[in-house]
Every structure is written in structure tokens, then in C-alpha cells.
Amino acid sequence: MRQTISTMAASSKTNMMQIMRGCICYTTVYRIWTNKNRTEGLTALCYLLFRNTCGQYSAQYSTVNLSGKSMAKLWGLNPDMITDTMLAGMTNSASVTGLWPSCPSDQHMLWKALLTTTLAKLRHRLGYHAYYTPVTIYIDSQTGLVTACEPVSGERSIPRPGLLKTDGMISVEESCLISTAMKHAEGAPLAHIKLSALKRTRQIPEFDMRIEIQTKEERFLREYKKVNSPYKKFKCDNNSNTIFKVVDNTLVLDHLQPPVRALSLVPTSFDCLVTTPAEFSLVALLATYAKWHEKLYSCDNESTNILVPILMYIGPETNPRGEDVDYSCIIGFPGWPIVKSSTANQTAIKDAIDAYVDTDGLWPLAGPRTFHLLAPWSPENHPFPMIDTSHILSVHSTDIRHKAADEWTTGRITCILRDPTLIENAAIAKFDFSAFFATLYLGLFPTHSRLHDVVKARLKREKPWLKRPILEFGGLLKKLNEDVYQSIISIGNHISIEVEATASSLMFAPCTYIKDGMWGTFMDKSKNVPRPPMDDERDFNILRNACAESANNFAATIGLQFPDEILLDLRLEGIYTHAMSWNANCYWLWNKSNHHKDFVGFPNQPRFASYAKHGLSTLLEKICISNDTDESLQTVREKTHEVFEELLSIAFDHRSDVSFWSCPTELYDDTQYIAALGMKAAARFDTSGFNRETVQTVTADGKIVSVTCSLFEGEIILPAIDCIDYMKPILAAFSRLLINVLSSKWDNVNRDDFTFDIESYRFMFINNK
């Protein structure tokens, strides 16, 4: 009898649930409101784009509670300035139809924090692992809401990208731009000023624009033309009307309130849209989406109980300080993501799609917080390490080693070569641990499966785009959880000492050790001099394996538990025959046989610096193959002057080339360019939030002025480029490093012979047009 009742109860529960199998392709926030929960006073209705096992898409919904103050702490915002009521009001305003949908200046970080934190809480609550992974979802038949997800075994689904092209340009009145810019006391990028000006108008502007979506199955094209009045829409031949469909879901969000209707545009043949800067107009996209949003939801929503979704854009353009990465994030409507590729190159597109899939769309939107948000625990509940690292390290280390490890609070950096030193005809090698600090983190927290996946990819040398988010993950850890950060740093320092000891036992002298890697040379024990170069890699690989084994043995001894396929992986980055060390952060390695080199610490910007770096490297090679006679020194001196004259000639030939002298900048104040650009400013507004290059110029009265040249298209007329002042610090470094090398080999070096007075050539560059 008891079994019958249990079976009936299970059957009744199943009947109340709709079960679907497939994968989640995308999630976003549909609406947010306050609730009566004291600790998590916000409820978010989230939209899920779901693809079933037959490849058909559906709109699904779920709710999750969150706290504005917890969100603020995670994102480094002031929790005392953020209330749940304020956030609910902000999101409600974003659901009003007929308004320009870009994020206001003071809400950029709030929207970014709110979206990413909500989606992290949603994934944690429902229990799905990642986008495109096989899952069973359970939908409450009474409420229409997804209540749980259950991961199932099987291959990860492949994204179905569509290609997005948008075209259109809004001309904003110069006076409007200037008045908007005046509100930014610290300045702002032109892209931000323009979007802010459009936001002030509140209405959707009318202008000629075009949107095209192309998939393997169909092509959707709409052109909107401002031809007199009213505003007209044109369809084109060979055009699909079925690329997405309107779906009406009835949801019960509160049993004390009537059901609501959630309308959504559900795609039929794509689950993400890929675009490139060359084929993308942000203003055209936002205007198009705003018009669709207005048309779909502009009916009498109260009588029809339609819940209007948020429509809000955040990107580098909405950040008043700009950003150094490009992305486009539309929150809420229409219900699919935009993936931006840097170029139309297939590799770049693949990397962009991979980044979307591997991070659930959080990279680069969430920046360093990406893999913190993808952890299997709630963002505000980071667990404690499984081991007491401080105690265990003190037990498994001598007092001297423990003290040495504790001295380096951001990672151990040592260099045994106290003075600039040239090493010639030796068995030199460079080693690095791959994803070192992220791997150590996994040793403390092996259940972080999303970090596990990407670290495993990096250990296999896959997906080079992962290098930055993994690196930034470790960098942010200090702010989010300093105790865990210091534990990892301390473990890393102890491992570096273990590796050095192992290397020394094999007669390899680490010249420089920097946090997660080293370079050095094999020594001849009997003569205490570097061993000559070796013909094969056998001894280097023996060394690599021994050092890696000692690192992993130490990790195991102190209790680190790495997940499957993860171990500390020491790479042999290169074998060399010559080296020049100036300090721990500046060195040159060269292989005489294959001419492979690694030059660290010399400036790379502007492009002139890369020519100087190449010239210096050429001289270093010349020095290494020369003997230490006075005749050889004279030959090097002559060659040095040839290199200098060649650099001077290259600089002169490029004296008017903006791209040759421009450098990336972190300055984002473009207010002074509004009058200069006038109505033409719109041509570059859409990239000024993230793509920024400046060049130093000299005006007619001798003043140095920095010009953000990336704002202008094609050839631009500038004052004389300040070539000499660009060259001065680069050539000073060139001479200083070169003299150090020469002094390591010859005793009678005349510094003046290798120092260049570039100032005496200023007359060549005064009028460089």
C-alpha cells in the first residue's frame, strides 16, 4: 500500500512537470521587481533560449532571487549607495517602449553587475553546467517556469551562428553633442557622448538604416528609409519572414496575482549572431531593436497582462571611461546574443564564438570576474580552502625557505646576476608553467569545473584567447578573496624554491626566476663555468620532467587535489646558446644555430620601437659572434652607427605616418574633437569606446599636443608629429642596454661612441609635411 501511494505521488509530480531535453543556448534578464525577502529583496524573471534534441528553439522562463548589496560587493561598488528598490526602478524604466535603449552614464557598472550576477545565480539555482551542454529541464505546468535542470551525458551541442550586418549613421547636432559633453567633467569618448545625446532625446530617431541576418537556411533583410513621412519599411527579394517567430507564454509569477503573458521573438535557425566592426552599426542595431520592441509591446499591456521586457544596451560605448575590449550586450529583448569578432577572419570568428560558448557569454563583458562568476558556488559564498596552507607550508618547509617564500607577496622574482651579464656559447633554456596560478587554484578548489575546462585547454595549447581571462582571474582574486590569493602566492613561491633546488641538483643554474617560470644555463661542475651548447634536447627534457615532478610532488605533499587531466605543467619554451641579462625583467636570449630569439623588456610601442628593438637584437648577435679584440669592437661600433643611421632614415621616411607613431592610450576624453569633427564625427563614433590610438604632435608655436588619431578616417591633416621626442627614450634605452653588453665583453668601451644625440636632428622633423 505504501509503495502504491509513493508511486501515485511520483506520477502526480511528473504530471505537474513538463520535461524537455536539449541545451540552453542563451540567458538574459527579462524583468526585475522587489519582493518581501529580507536577505534577497529582488526577484528576476530570466529568459532562456532553449534548443531541444530535434533542433527546435523555444522560449523558457525562470525566476531567481538576489540582493543588490551582495551584487555591489562582488563588483566593488558601494553597497550603501545601492538599494533593491533603486535597481528595480532602474530596470522598470528600461522596459518602457519607444525610448533610446543605450545605458545611461551612471548606470553602466550597475547594469553589468546586475546582469552577470543574476545569470550566475540563475545557473547555480537551476543546476545546469554550461551553455550547449546536454540537459533535462523541468517546467512547472502550473506556473510555466523552469524549476530545475539536470545535466545528462552526451556531446556538447554546436552553436548555430547567424551573420549580422547593420548599416546606418545618425547625425547628431553639434550643439547637442557639446551640451552633452559638458556634463562629463572628466571627459568621455565620442561614442559615449553620442549615445548620451541620443538618450537625452528619449525618442527613437529616424534615419536610413539596414539590418541583415543570414543563416545556412535563410536570409532576413530589412531596410528602413526616411522618405518624407511616415517612416517606411522596405522588404527585399529573396527575403525570409520565418527567421524568428513571436511566441506567447503564460506565466504565474505570484499565485496572488493574475497570470502574465511574456511575448518573445524566438529564432528558428540561429542561436547567436556574429558580426564584425566593419559590418556593424551600433546606432542602426539599437534603433531597429527599439522599433521592434515598440511594435511588439505597444498595445494596452494592462488589459492584456503583457509583461514588457527590458531593452537595454551595454558595451564599451556606454562606459564613460571607455574599455580596451569590444563587445555588445543587449539585455532582455529580443532574446539572442551578439558575438563580436575583431575581423572577418575565420580564426577570429571561431575564437569569438568559442569565447561565448566557454564563458556563457561573460567574456569579455565581465572581464576579470568571468570565471569567478562561473564557479559552482554562489558569487557571494566562496568556500574556504580544503587545507590550512599556512600551517602545512610551515611543516613541509625549512625556516629559511619559508621566510624566503613569504617575502614575495605578489609572486617570487629573483635574479642571481646582480650586474648586466653576457653569457656566450652555453646550454641555455627557458621554462614556464602553463596557467600556473589558475592550476594552483584548482588544487585548492577542484570542483570549479568551468575553470578546469579552460585550464585543460590551455595545457593542451588550445584556444589562445583564454590566456587573458585566465590571467585576469588570478589578478582579481586578491580583491575578492585575499586569503585565498595569499595562499596561492605562498604555494607558488614554495614551488619555485623546490624547482630551483631540483634544477641545481642537475647542474642547471636558474639565472632568473619570475613567478611561474625561469631561464638559466647548465653548468660544468668541474670547471664551474657554463656548459657549451648541446646538439639535442635530451638533457633539457630530463630537467623539465624532473622540475615538473618536484613541483607536483610538493603540491601533493601539502594536500593539493588537482582534478582529472590537470597537473602543474612545465613547458620548455626555448633552447638558446647566448644570453644577455640586464635585470630580472629585461633579458635577451638567442640561439646561434636557428636564430630563434626572445627579447624581453624593450619597448614595443610605437612602431619605431619595434625597428629599434630589431636593430639592437641584430647588434647583439654581431657581438656574440665576435671575439674580444679591439678590431672587433671597432667593427661593432661601425655597425652600430649603420643601425642608427638606418633607424634615422626609417623615422624620416615615416615622419608623416600617423600609424607609425601612434600608440594605444587609456585616455578617453574626446570632448575637444566635437567641433573639429562636426557632423562627420558619427563615422567614427561607434569604435571610439574601445579602439583608441593617440599621436603626439607639435603645433606652430611649439606646444606638444596629443591627438586621438583613431577618431579620424583615412588621411588626416595634423601638425608636425613629435618624432624626436618619441625617439629619445627609445634610443636612450637602446644605447644604455648596448653599452651594458659591450662592457661585459670589452674593458675599453667609450660610451660616447654608442650614445646618439638625436636632438641635433630635430631640424629634419620640424616641418614634416
Curated annotation (Swiss-Prot):
Q: What does this protein do?
A: Component of the helicase/primase complex. Unwinds the DNA at the replication forks and generates single-stranded DNA for both leading and lagging strand synthesis. The primase synthesizes short RNA primers on the lagging strand that the polymerase presumably elongates using dNTPs. The primase-associated factor has no known catalytic activity in the complex and may serve to facilitate the formation of the replisome by directly interacting with the origin-binding protein and the polymerase.
Q: Which InterPro entries match?
A: HSV_HEPA
Lineage top rank: taxon? Viruses
- Origin species: Gallid herpesvirus 2 (strain Chicken/Md5/ATCC VR-987)
Q: Read off the Pfam families from this record.
A: Herpes_HEPA
| GO CC list | host cell nucleus
State whether keyword Chaperone applies: no
Family stated for the protein in its record: Belongs to the herpesviridae HEPA family.
Q: What is its main location?
A: host cell
Question: Tell me, how does this one assemble?
Answer: Associates with the primase and the helicase to form the helicase-primase complex. Interacts with the origin-binding protein. Interacts with the polymerase catalytic subunit.
Q: What name has this protein been given in UniProt? A: DNA helicase/primase complex-associated protein
Alphabetically list the UniProt keywords: DNA replication, Host nucleus
One GO biological process this protein is involved in is: viral genome replication
Q: Answer yes or no on keyword Ribosomal protein.
A: no
User: Where is this chain's protein located in or outside the cell?
Assistant: Host nucleus
